[in-house]
Amino acid sequence: MTLETIDVTSVARRVVPEGCGATVTLDGYARRFTRVRETGEVRETEYLVYEAYEPMALKEMEKLIGRVKGEFEIANVGIVHRLGKLEIGETSVVI
């Protein structure tokens, strides 16, 4: 978890063991428009603010990593989630 801007390439490179030749990343970001499920209305987003109870969030991330590594043949998994105010287009999470 971080309050700083996330560098997607840097995060991916930190978790890749030397024996791996490729990475797969999910890059989540703050989007400009959101569709309301119940009404179908499209609303414009000005910015996002992420908050977390960090001890619990980190514990849940570790559980998620454990589940994924148990189900798939994956060498390593890393998750970085942004906290604080994000402007449109800024990265919110990298997995």
Language model segments and positions:
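Phosphate/diphosphate ligand-binding glycine-rich loop within oxidoreductases
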Residues: 95
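N-terminal, polar/charged subdomain of small-to-medium soluble alpha/beta proteins
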Residues: 1-91
